[in-house]
Amino acid sequence: MHNKSVAELSRELESGRISSVELTQQFLDRLKTEDGKYNSFITISDEQALAEARAADEMRAAGKATVWTGVPFAHKDIFCTSGIRTSCGSKMLDNFVPPYDATVTANFKAAGAVCLGKTNMDEFAMGSSNESSFYGAVTNPWGLSGGDKRVPGGSSGGSAAAVAARLVPAATGTDTGGSIRQPAALCGITGLKPTYGRVSRYGMIAFASSLDQGGPMARTAEDAALMLNVMAGHDPKDSTCIDREVPDYTATLNEPLKGLKIGLPKEYFSDQLAPAMEEQVRNAIREYEKLGATVKEVSLPNAKLAIAAYYVIAPAEASANLSRFDGVRYGYRCEDPKDLMDMYTRSRAEGFGNEVKRRILVGSYALSAGYFDAYYLKAQKVRRLIQQDFINAFKEVDVLMSPVSPTPAFRQGEKNTDPVSMYLEDVFTIAINLAGIPAMSVPAGFVDGLPVGLQIIGDYFSEARLLNAAHQFQQVTDWHQREPQ
């Protein structure tokens, strides 16, 4: 059963060939025997999962089942789950058990899905390799046969590794600068970052509030569409959540692609892209031409400024968001503080990891009195230029296509001493978050036995078009079906 997609598992449950309790137990057993190799989970919630599975079987017996009823999945450990620890990969929240559910969590519960647990992640979603987690690094299921341990990408590396290793059929992720798409690409799965405001952020622990967006991670575009059907929608608890009708994202998956206009941003096919990666991406684009699409080169002239702008805006917002973790109300508190200031200082110094502290420092500096205009305000002006570049491009084409990552998965520890080198891993994904548009990663080949992702970028609220393009590609290729050895 572990090799079946969400859609296939739903049909198995519908037919009565297996119950949700049996299916859930199979996945829990596999998780406990296999995850030692990957460290993709922080918390496995056996009792709650089996209770949800029993409720799902009752729901089905009463004729109230949805597509998701009884289907196992996992949440990235950034979504609050009532009664289940939500750590955000940090010592700071190692003992935090939320008293409420995030909206995304509540939506899956209402659909009858079964949450097996919480997946590992970079601490507070800050990272591109899933090596900054308080619970240890996650290992990419690909490349293990050669004796190498590769990173799965970050920050949603646990979700990506768990789906790639067939430990769960699907998992939620979040994307602030590439944190769904980059791990999806490096682990050979499908991942979608929706339009900013399409998915509620209520109960999703904040990193950078104007950039964060939750989204689906699964093996197929069809499964991603099924997930987005549950995740998307207006939520009055999140003031940035858009009040706009949610289509059935599975309804247009089979539309033909004849006449689709594809733009290739010349800035994303630059010297930063490894030649072998470019070859795989261009091969994938040729498949689209066979499906009836046309291709032209376009320009995003301000793309080169994206990383500089992002690493002012995101840390600035993070420094404000993370100021709430002070040892007073919840989270880690240092032992025997001398006074209030000592408690604040030591709780944060001991509770946060190095990468989080680095970004808080950068963000606080960018927001400080003498530098606000020079850094933060200027970065926001650059952000507007980047957004306008995409608006202009979509006047000419329907979608943009590019690589997701400049290289395949690198070895664990390879970039830990060079933060800038690590930040450059997101060079092709960050601008999309700054603009707030949707984009997804689709498996598109291999380099040296490691997966390559094709990035499909769309205009605002064009998730259905992206999923359609990805699904049609997956009908004529089998990259998404390959399994790590």
UniProtKB/Swiss-Prot annotation:
One of its GO terms (biological process) is translation. Keywords: ATP-binding, Ligase, Nucleotide-binding, Protein biosynthesis. InterPro entries: Amidase, Amidase_CS, Amidase_dom, AS_sf, GatA. One of its GO terms (cellular component) is glutamyl-tRNA(Gln) amidotransferase complex. GO terms for molecular function: ATP binding; glutaminyl-tRNA synthase (glutamine-hydrolyzing) activity. SUPFAM superfamilies: Amidase signature (AS) enzymes. Pfam families: Amidase (PF01425). The active site is at 76 (charge relay system), 155 (charge relay system), 179 (acyl-ester intermediate). It comes from the Bacteria. Its EC number is 6.3.5.7. It catalyses: L-glutamyl-tRNA(Gln) + L-glutamine + ATP + H2O = L-glutaminyl-tRNA(Gln) + L-glutamate + ADP + phosphate + H(+). Heterotrimer of A, B and C subunits. Allows the formation of correctly charged Gln-tRNA(Gln) through the transamidation of misacylated Glu-tRNA(Gln) in organisms which lack glutaminyl-tRNA synthetase. The reaction takes place in the presence of glutamine and ATP through an activated gamma-phospho-Glu-tRNA(Gln). Belongs to the amidase family. GatA subfamily. This is Glutamyl-tRNA(Gln) amidotransferase subunit A. It comes from Marinobacter nauticus (strain ATCC 700491 / DSM 11845 / VT8) (Marinobacter aquaeolei). The gene is gatA.
